[in-house]
């Protein structure tokens, strides 16, 4: 077993071994303790993810360990007294539901490509999970825990560096979508939106720095749920970049026909930190959906505001 994953009291942990790996997996059973572990995940099937991972290794001097995962090397680095592991998987990144059975990290950051028909160069962050059916990984009507502060930190770093380096990229939140649906804080840091951008080493470096920024604390953040508007919500993005607001889950207009009070409750409860408010993109919500949203938020005691 790798010493780097051990805690002081071995009796408080259970170690499992996943098929095709020799990396010990820790589940901490000691009441009130959480392993200080951050995971960065990239898929060998993902050009952008591998590009971002290379930038992490090159710019942050990640150490190659003797461990392996999915028959791939494992890298490690300590940030702010938090052990950070960089792992490579051989499946598509949305098909990683199995990770929830293996790890219990403080934060899991997926390094990923972003694809869109528009092809607009984009740097983005979002929480994975399914607001309705599970078309692309994960489980139906089940969202991951949203690390709102971590995503805000990553978004801020993306915006700062792309301006400093003169990169012609949009920076944006995306709504909560696709798998996996994990019971740990999880986020995607993405580079897109076409193969040209996936291979852009300068943009990949920005995403790598953003992933590291996600590890930082954000004690002054005001955590919010976003509802309404498009898949890429410029209003929510601007609020996060110019105020203390940090968005966790974002429910877009197109998902609202399938969203009910239970999903809204889940999005509030499955967010790191207390959700102080729900920000409603009022013009981006059909009139027929507004009453159920307001009623659900009132029942939860969550203040709402319109933008």
Regions found by a protein language model. Name each.
Residues 9-183, 194-195, 201-205, 212-234, ...:
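N-terminal catalytic or cofactor-binding beta/alpha core of small enzyme domains
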